[in-house]
């Protein structure tokens, strides 16, 4: 058995088209929903804890549907449009396929791990007491559990109050828009010293959008700042991991070309990242001095 492919033949078409990654993606998608709705760990709390005493916002600045559009649909459409414009026809289908595969893996894997972690941590949201509606007359500075003191009839909303760390909006926005940032850097050759600065600024826009989405969760009192920071870090790391699984580093001589791309596509004009030879930097030799 081959150590690389785990099959009897050393090479197969599935390696180039990353069929095993497609299978992993399907598993992540199927597991996401049940993982999120698992029973979270219910931590004890004080009814006079000011950090969980904020009002419950009935209207969110970025709800779940908007999050999916901003962090997954928009990056997907951007990749399809820009990729169709810039990519050479010899590898157009492959570059679009692998680019979208990497984005999907980054987004759904981040969502899976975020939901799994937040259910195990069970930290309370900033608006938890408004969700709980505790009975009146309870003593201060005393630990309580939700089942003992909460009077709300909305059990699903109450359980969601235990899912704050890390922030899913933050992790998923940085997973999708962070991946788009890396992808734009590679496709626009932003790390080449010959390219204008505006390319880097355009590539940076998705990160700005992700940051605004993440910060909106503190404005809605859905998350603490540490939840947003941890979620953003998780999403960014996952975006980088899955981007590098598909593409070379953004400072590679051919950063736009997928790693498994066997086409002969190269840059029309050579863009090198090599150091200038010392003799060009110091043309005067010892003999001429």
From Swiss-Prot:
Membrane topology recorded in Swiss-Prot or TrEMBL: Multi-pass membrane protein
Homology family: Belongs to the PA-phosphatase related phosphoesterase family.
Induction: Induced by the transcription factor ZAP1 during zinc depletion and negatively regulated by the transcription factor GIS1 predominantly during nutrient limitation. Induced by inositol supplementation.
Primary subcellular site in the record, as a coarse category: membrane
GO MF, any single term: identical protein binding
SMART domains, A to Z: acidPPc (SM00014)
GO CC annotation: fungal-type vacuole membrane; membrane; membrane raft
Residue spans, topological domain Vacuolar: 1-21, 87-92, 244-289
Residues the record lists as Phosphoserine modifications: 285
Function: Catalyzes the dephosphorylation of diacylglycerol diphosphate (DGPP) to phosphatidate (PA) and the subsequent dephosphorylation of PA to diacylglycerol (DAG). Together with LPP1, regulates intracellular DGPP and PA levels, which are phospholipid molecules believed to play a signaling role in stress response. Can also use lysophosphatidic acid (LPA) and phosphatidylglycerophosphate as substrates. Substrate preference is DGPP > LPA > PA. Activity is independent of a divalent cation ion and insensitive to inhibition by N-ethylmaleimide.
Keyword Metal-binding attributed: no
Region named Phosphatase sequence motif I: 118-126
Segments of this protein annotated with the region Phosphatase sequence motif III: 216-227
Regulation of activity: Inhibited by sodium fluoride (NaF) and pyrophosphate. Strongly inhibited by manganese ion and, to a lower extent, by magnesium and calcium ions. Also inhibited by Cu(2+) ion. In an indirect manner, it is also inhibited by the zinc ion which is able to form a complex with DGPP and prevent the enzyme from removing the phosphate from the substrate. Not inhibited by N-ethylmaleimide.
Other remarks on this protein: Present with 3038 molecules/cell in log phase SD medium.
Listed name of the protein: Diacylglycerol pyrophosphate phosphatase 1
Regions that span the bilayer: 22-42, 66-86, 93-113, 173-193, 194-214, 223-243
Activity's dependence on pH: Optimum pH is 6.0-8.5. Optimum pH for geranylgeranyl-P-P phosphatase reaction is 5.0-5.5.
Region annotated Phosphatase sequence motif II, chain positions: 166-169
BP-aspect Gene Ontology terms: phospholipid dephosphorylation; phospholipid metabolic process
Impact upon substituting residue 169 to A: 91% decrease of DGPP phosphatase activity
Catalytic activity annotation: a 1,2-diacyl-sn-glycerol 3-diphosphate + H2O = a 1,2-diacyl-sn-glycero-3-phosphate + phosphate + H(+); a 1,2-diacyl-sn-glycero-3-phosphate + H2O = a 1,2-diacyl-sn-glycerol + phosphate; a 1-acyl-sn-glycero-3-phosphate + H2O = a 1-acyl-sn-glycerol + phosphate
EC numbers for this chain: 3.6.1.75, 3.1.3.106, 3.1.3.4
Record comment regarding domains: The phosphatase sequence motif I (including Arg-125) and II (including His-169) are part of the cytoplasmic loop 2 and phosphatase sequence motif III (including His-223) is part of the cytoplasmic loop 3.
Subcellular location: Vacuole membrane
